[in-house]
């Protein structure tokens, strides 16, 4: 677009000289002063692009009209309007050429018919006017009521009368007003009904009971409390008896032999005997060899004749038992040494252990 502006400026400078000649009458000089379409300066610009041909032709036509018609003021604003209109005659301007002018020209701000005054100011004016009207009407109404109150005292009460009545009720000037409930002007509107105070006062004025009646009432209350306390005592006694009965039944089931026993001594003897028997069984299971030796000793004591033979047998058995035990130990050591070499260990069998069974 700068290039087009430069061309227009050149055309204007060139157009000044022919206009001077036109005033003297030289028409040839007018034609010769303007560059032709076939010149070298104009030809490259015309062939630069097909999209600018229309604009260039219009400029040439305008230049010719201005040169032949005489002096005519052709401002830059008119040229800009025509130049911008050329770009939208059926095609779009693609590229940077002409983009600067379009961006520089800001769109005009739209104008609306509405007034841009603050609405809050209008509202404030309206509300002030309304308040003035309302206040005037209220003043008129109150004045009319005041006049009616002076002339007709039996009419509707004014605000002053209601305020005076409330003050008198609060201060309690008269006794009759003290007994009556306080009447507030808006109490019925908010609460729906007056506060019922006289009922409580009437209840307090009931006849008092005599001393005899009071004594009778206390006696009746004492009897009732005693009956309740006695019932509470009977309940734990019955529960205690039932618990004892259950404990006795359990003991009888556990110790059935205690039924026939009358005294506690036989029970002690029986428990001792049971304990001794349990100990003997335990020793027999754990140490069967000692139990055999004990039986033989008891038999030798009972039969002294065969005691010598028994003693010989016992000594022989002891020697044999020790010999067998030594053999087992040697075998165990040999086995353990072999298993240690092979990475194995010997496990005892059930024959080497005595199982305790009760």
Swiss-Prot record:
GO terms for biological process: negative gravitropism; positive gravitropism; regulation of auxin polar transport. The chain crosses the membrane at residues 87-107. GO terms for cellular component: nucleus; plasma membrane. It is found in: Cell membrane; Nucleus. It is a single-pass membrane protein. Expressed in shoot apical meristem, vascular tissues, stele, endodermis and upper portion of the inflorescence stem. Expressed in the endodermis of inflorescence stems and hypocotyls. A motif (Nuclear localization signal) lies at residues 231-253. It comes from the Eukaryota. Disruption phenotype: Defective shoot gravitropism. Increased angle of inflorescence branches. Changing residue 92 to A: Switches the shoot gravity responses from upward bending to downward bending. A motif (IGT motif) lies at residues 90-96. PANTHER family: PROTEIN LAZY 1. Involved in the regulation of shoot gravitropism. Involved in the regulation of inflorescence branch angle. Functions redundantly with LAZY2, LAZY3 and LAZY4 to control plant architecture by coupling gravity sensing to the formation of auxin gradients. Involved redundantly with LAZY2 and LAZY4 in the regulation of both shoot and root gravitropism. Mediates gravity signaling in statocytes downstream of amyloplast displacement, leading to the generation of asymmetric auxin distribution in gravity-responding organs. Belongs to the LAZY family. This is Protein LAZY 1. It comes from Arabidopsis thaliana. The lineage of its organism: Eukaryota, Viridiplantae, Streptophyta, Embryophyta, Tracheophyta.
């Amino acid at each position: 677009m700068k290039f087009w502006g430069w061309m227009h400026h050149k055309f204007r400078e060139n157009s000044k000289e022919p206009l001077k000649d036109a005033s003297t009458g030289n028409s040839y000089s007018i034609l010769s002063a303007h560059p032709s379409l076939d010149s070298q300066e104009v030809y490259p610009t015309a062939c630069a692009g097909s999209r600018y041909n229309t604009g260039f032709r219009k400029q040439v036509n305008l230049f010719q009209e201005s040169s032949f018609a005489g002096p005519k003021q052709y401002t830059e604003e008119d040229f800009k309007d025509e130049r911008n209109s050329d770009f939208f005659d059926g095609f779009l301007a693609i590229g940077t050429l002409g983009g600067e002018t379009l961006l520089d020209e800001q769109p005009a701000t739209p104008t609306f018919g509405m007034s841009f005054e603050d609405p809050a100011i209008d509202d404030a004016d309206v509300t002030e006017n309304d308040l003035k009207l309302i206040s005037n009407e209220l003043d008129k109404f109150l004045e009319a009521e005041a006049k009616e109150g002076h002339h007709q005292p039996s009419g509707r009460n004014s605000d002053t009368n209601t305020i005076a009545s409330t003050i008198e009720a609060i201060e309690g000037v008269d006794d009759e007003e003290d007994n009556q409930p306080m009447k507030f002007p808006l109490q019925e509107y908010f609460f729906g009904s007056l506060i019922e105070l006289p009922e409580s006062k009437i209840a307090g004025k009931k006849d008092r009971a005599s001393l005899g009646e009071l004594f009778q009432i206390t006696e009746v209350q004492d009897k009732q409390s005693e009956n309740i306390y006695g019932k509470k005592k009977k309940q734990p006694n019955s529960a205690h008896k039932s618990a004892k009965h259950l404990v006795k039944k359990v003991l009888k089931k556990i110790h059935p032999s205690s039924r026939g026993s009358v005294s506690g001594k036989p029970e002690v003897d029986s428990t001792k005997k049971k304990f001794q028997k349990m100990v003997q069984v335990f020793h027999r299971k754990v140490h069967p060899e000692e139990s055999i030796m004990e039986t033989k000793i008891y038999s030798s004591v009972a039969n002294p004749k065969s005691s010598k033979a028994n003693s010989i047998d016992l000594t022989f058995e002891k020697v044999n038992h020790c010999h067998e035990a030594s053999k087992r130990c040697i075998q165990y050591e040999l086995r353990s040494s072999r298993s240690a070499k092979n990475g194995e260990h010997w496990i005892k069998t059930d024959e080497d252990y005595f199982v305790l069974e009760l």
